[in-house]
Amino acid sequence: MLKIIIPTLMLIPLTWLSKNSMIWINTTAYSLLISFISLPLLSQFNENSLNMSLTFFSDPLSAPLLVLTTWLLPLMIMASQHHLSKEPLARKKLYITMLITLQTFLIMTFTATELIFFYILFEATLIPTLIIITRWGNQTERLNAGFYFLFYTLTGSLPLLIALTHIQNLTGSLNLLLIQYSTQTLPSSWSNAFLWLACMMAFMVKMPLYGLHLWLPKAHVEAPIAGSMVLAAILLKLGGYGMLRITMILNPLTSYMAYPFLMLSLWGMIMTSSICLRQTDLKSLIAYSSVSHMALVIVAVLIQTPWSYMGATALMIAHGLTSSVLFCLANSNYERTHSRTMILARGLQTLLPLMAMWWLLASLTNLALPPTINLVGELFVVMSSFSWSNITIILMGTNIIITALYSLYMLITTQRGKYTHHINNIKPSFTRENTLMALHLLPLLLLSLNPKIILGTLY
């Protein structure tokens, strides 16, 4: 793990010591190099102990998320170039430093062995994100969004710390590698029910569960492009990863404690998809679509079958890349038209034909068209939920139809129609932007050739 963590940390001196013209080139090139170094982790399995130590380890569940984290840093740096072009040099460097520290915290979170260590890093990721949102956001509402983000997440995760210390007293260890073998089955009592709630609530706020999701659209809409990308692609996955990790301690409580949350998620995914159909704000639409996709992951984790676990991990990776590319596209529109309102930026297909192709591909990926990896994840989740209860097929089917509807609605409102006259002199798309979209969409298409590397521990 150190072979990824130390190079990532060394990007910080690289940023501050690079000369003005070389900042973007250097950081992008070296962070891409780091993401290629992390790729061999995908093919190392549990029997291979080369990547285990007392503090860090990786297994088939954390490796895909780790690779996604490292892959996203160069893409975030590429996406931020335009909106930082007018900033002074020190501020550019500070921004990149924030992204790199966030990246380091995330890598350590995904590979932490100890649950308390995991918790500390889980909280530490809040600080760089908060600074990115409240310092470089576009409107003044960003402070409000930062408050929402911080207080929702902190309130959710305080009980987790208490629960973890209680589990430490109970079992004598919080080491993830040991705790798999030392867990006692928790008897059903009131205190254990609260223990379950305390453990799961932090991750459900982070996911976010429908009803606790109000911080997400706010944070997304106000964040700068890199903030939106990392929030959608990785910070939401922390919730799913934590749930997958902590449910193995909480057996057999989950089997009957999960019902209200399953209902909330199944209802919430339809509600948030329907909210998407009524959105005027492009970034807000993508944020709500994130909530509905993550609701599927919550359902999959709480059903607790091998198939649903595989579906959850596949869907997390797929959604990370998809929502990220949608935010990049929305940002490229925003940089040209200076408005996130969809009605004010219609008919862009005639002005940016190549961008229209990326829009089409991203929308089709979002509605889980084969051969993308989204389809693999959704199929696993739908089939496992159907075998858990037949009625869910109605809800899942409705959700899939509404997802297709709002994805196409987003595509048609931005690309088709007669373009408004105030945007007839916009710049064509840059090579940088096309590269950015290609680097998002290529993994999505290529992973479907070999999906087993992202199907998690149980494959």
Swiss-Prot record:
Disulphide linkage map: none
GO biological process, one term: mitochondrial electron transport, NADH to ubiquinone
Location within or outside the cell: Mitochondrion inner membrane
Catalytic activity: a ubiquinone + NADH + 5 H(+)(in) = a ubiquinol + NAD(+) + 4 H(+)(out)
Chief location: mitochondrion
Leader sequence segment: none
Keyword field: Electron transport, Membrane, Mitochondrion, Mitochondrion inner membrane, NAD, Respiratory chain, Translocase, Transmembrane, Transmembrane helix, Transport, Ubiquinone
InterPro entries named among the record's database cross-references: NADH4_N, NADH_Q_OxRdtase_chainM/4, NADH_UbQ_OxRdtase, ND/Mrp_TM
UniProt topology in membrane: Multi-pass membrane protein
Residue ranges crossing the lipid bilayer per the database entry: 22-42, 60-80, 95-112, 113-133, 145-165, 194-214, 224-244, 257-277, 284-303, 308-330, 351-371, 391-411, 436-456
GO molecular function: NADH dehydrogenase (ubiquinone) activity; ubiquinone binding
Keyword Transmembrane: yes
Protein EC: 7.1.1.2
Subunit field text: Core subunit of respiratory chain NADH dehydrogenase (Complex I) which is composed of 45 different subunits.
Protein function: Core subunit of the mitochondrial membrane respiratory chain NADH dehydrogenase (Complex I) which catalyzes electron transfer from NADH through the respiratory chain, using ubiquinone as an electron acceptor. Essential for the catalytic activity and assembly of complex I.
NCBIfam families: NDH_I_M (TIGR01972)
The family this protein is said to belong to: Belongs to the complex I subunit 4 family.
Designated name of the protein: NADH-ubiquinone oxidoreductase chain 4
Highest classification ranks of the organism: Eukaryota, Metazoa, Chordata, Craniata, Vertebrata
Gene responsible for this protein: MT-ND4
